[in-house]
Amino acid sequence: MKGLGDSRPRHLSDSLDPPHEPLFAGPDRNPYLLSPTEAFAREARFPGQNTLPGDGLFPLNNQLPPPSSTFPRIHYNSHFEVPEESPFPSHAQATKINRLPANLLDQFEKQLPIHRDGFSTLQFPRGEAKARGESPGRIRHLVHSVQRLFFTKAPSMEGTTGKVGGNGGKKGVLEDGKGRRAKSKERAKAGEPKRRSRSNISGWWSSDDNLDGEGGAFRSGPASGLMTLGRQPERTQPRYFMHAYNTISGHMLKTTKNTTTELTAPPPPPAPPATCPSLGVGTDTNYVKRGSWSTLTLSHAHEVCQKTSATLDKSLLKSKSCHQGLAYHYLQVPGGGGEWSTTLLSPRDMDSTAEGPIPCRRMRSGSYIKAMGDEDSDESGGGSPKPSPKTAARRQSYLRATQQSLGEQSNPRRSLDRLDSVDMPLPSKYPSWEEDYNPISDSLNDSGCISQVFGQASLIPQLFGHDQQVREADLSDQYEAACESACSEAESTAAEALDLSLPSYFRSRSHSYLRAIQAGCSQEEDSVSLQSLSPPPSTGSLSNSRTLPSSSCLVAYKKTPPPVPPRTTSKPFISVTVQSSTESAQDTYLDSQDHKSEVTSQSGLSNSSDSLDSSTRPPSVTRGGITPGPEAPEPPPKHAALKSEHGTLTSSESHSEAVPKRKLSSIGIQVDCIQPVPKEEPSPATKFQSIGVQVEDDWRSSAPSHSMSSRRDTDSDTQDANDSSCKSSERSLPDCTSHPNSISIDAGPRQAPKIAQIKRNLSYGDNSDPALEASSLPPPDPWMETSSSSPAEPAQPGACRRDGYWFLKLLQAETERLEGWCCQMDKETKENNLSEEVLGKVLSAVGSAQLLMSQKFQQFRGICEQNLNPDANPRPTAQDLAGFWDLLQLSIEDISMKFDELYHLKANSWQLVETPEKRKEEKKPPPPVPKKPAKSKAAVSRDKASDAGDKQRQEARKRLLAAKRAASVRQNSATESADSIEIYVPEAQTRL
């Protein structure tokens, strides 16, 4: 139960986001450091108004000293403050408490003096240095269990809480959300032992501490105070909220699960103040205790959820004035507790609300951290399993939706809530809160703002990176549970408001790419919303989700791509890849679908749905490619956004402003769904060839370049033909006019170059380094160019048959290549003061090349001309030409090796590097001079030596010729199939 209690404190942190109203009526009431023995006399601040007495009613045994965990649940009056700290009473307590009807809890709450210190500082004596194994995930489980199972499985929930915190925060959350049961139990069981023992600076458990322990991101106890709804900064002041925020979240949610209807009914949403008494957000109180947060109704839960996300963003910013100085950053929502309290639906909602901020944190600790390898994830990783990508996606989408629609619509902001628990549309107040929230989130965009709001930069990463992910994800799940049980109708309303099918967006996650390609992303606006929701893979990802906590999660999530691997620069455009299109992108997609899919997409945010859109709209690829190109640098900002959330948010915002630049990173397909503007830059699309997905537009516009690239691939065999291979391949198109297909036109030239190049490679074995050849060598395949000049070539079918023209082309290419090498070496000798040895090598290579060109090349040229002359007698056949060419290849290979060595020397600043072989040879003693034998013996030995040398040379030549013939056969077959290959590649890319 203590573990649960700690989890509860996490709820406190969950409720970190304050309601719009000042969470605390005023710091007039100092945080009550209720000793565990001290009855949790509710402060007057939290009078019976807390309609959700569950929080306050349920003693947070964890918060209470060890005895407090044992004190009867009925001691709610006395223990309410501490219970706030304890998210969940001890199993027995929690179970009993949860079993208490909402009315009973309300009565208890009323009976108890409510400390209206608010959540300012839920500092509970840490008499028990409890291992706070509860992580956001674990608390999430507790909340879910409380919401759905705690009333029935309070003990198991508590046990589960520990587990959740330690192990399956994410799983537990998801499972708790779906079957808040066994895992909750397991977590409660493991939670106690796993609970992190947090040494709070004050020595008291603060709501932040609870959050920290459970949120992981909020582990820093005092710093955790940041999550404290109470504005009061006295971190050292232990504050007990008479209605344990977490208790209500957990216990009330548990009871709420049972009595959610009861709680909701007894404290009807219309009387949010009554429902909010626990909130302390009641109209009478500006400070909302965590308990009150948990008490927040579903509407408040939505608000809180989003606001809690915003709490980091808006609430923190709004409470920034309060927070900056606060030891415990009391998140104060300018909107006023009234809105929140008025929107209160049920303790469960309150719990969800309490978790509102935590979903983001949970998300951050969860999928986001997973993807990002967030430091926060490390903090809370052990304590709380990270929320599943879905949860993270939900939270992200929620954040994005909230960001997008905070100003525009409250529901979109609730997208996360909707995604998590599509149970209620936020009240109109919530939108106003969202509006406030947006500025806050904007302010929070800067990590400085965040640190200001939270007072600890270190906390911020934790909050945003991990706890928010985990907690927000958990809260999302918990919120789902609470909303489901408490606000099914609100859920339907929210679903309607969402206009999203949660399943669909989940499906879109898994099938976003297919959807984009197949459906063409008819939901451009959805994809746009995804883009906006999940800002462009670059920093923009946060732009729409101004809610820094959640948006930073999103950004981090996408940035996580860096950890996950942000895609390449082009991939950043591929929001899906970066964005975990399966998760946040789709959540975002659904969310933004509702309200801001278009707006968000305009915001330049690219989501998986965005990429889906781009995928579906291959023509947009050019735009997408173009757009991503400009934004390709942004992906680093995206990571930067992870680093500096404000920066990311800023980028996102700027992206949102530049809708046309929206990065459409369809999965592997760069397509700009919504932005025709990116079409302006079709050239970048070609850049995406590396992606392997080329949109038809790009292919059509850059088909030659594609074929060129293919050619280059083939030519890459002969790296020396880099530049000229393109030219020659283009020229070879005419040369190989025989290739009927325009595509194969490129292919044809490639085929010829391929053959020649392949032969060349085989013969010279890549005589020169690709880099050297590309930069310093003459056009690699001039022969290909000559092929264009040979009109007879077109007659040849696709294979560019090897006749005189073919070999003349090869000869011309080789001649130009060798001449280029010679010229290059001449320049080098003139420009550089080469050593005699190097100069000798240069002269040797150049002389050999010139000799080869002047003699053998000329001879071969004559043979080729004879072959082309039908009247020639004898007329050499193609086989004769091929055989002679193979012989030439031996010489060309030797010369190529020499030039290759020269280029290596050049790369080495013309410094001779003795190879081990040479050294060995030098070291090897000269062969012993045979003693002068008889002349006859000497003659015999000479004959034998000459014979042996001749045999070796002949064998080597035979091997070379055999290898060359085999290579020639391979080249021929490749050339013959070049057309189909060439056609196939473009088709495949076009299909993509």
From Swiss-Prot:
Signal peptide range in chain numbering: none
Membrane topology: Peripheral membrane protein
Single GO MF annotation: protein domain specific binding
Bias (Polar residues): 199-208, 399-413, 576-591, 969-978
Regions that span the bilayer: none
Phosphoserine PTM positions: 206-207, 377, 380, 384, 388, 405, 415, 421, 580-581, 609, 611, 665, 744, 973
Residues modified as Phosphothreonine: 915
Disulphide bridges: none
Entry comment describing in which tissues the protein is expressed: Expressed in brain.
Domain of life per record: Eukaryota
Primary location group: membrane
Keywords: Membrane, Methylation, Phosphoprotein
Bias (Gly residues): 162-171
Gene Ontology CC annotation, any one: cholinergic synapse
PANTHER family, alphabetized: DISKS LARGE-ASSOCIATED PROTEIN 4 (PTHR12353:SF19), DISKS LARGE-ASSOCIATED PROTEIN DAP SAP90/PSD-95-ASSOCIATED PROTEIN (PTHR12353)
Protein family per UniProt: Belongs to the SAPAP family.
Role noted for this protein: May play a role in the molecular organization of synapses and neuronal cell signaling. Could be an adapter protein linking ion channel to the subsynaptic cytoskeleton. May induce enrichment of PSD-95/SAP90 at the plasma membrane.
Protein name (Swiss-Prot/TrEMBL): Disks large-associated protein 4
Organism for this UniProt entry: Rattus norvegicus (Rat)
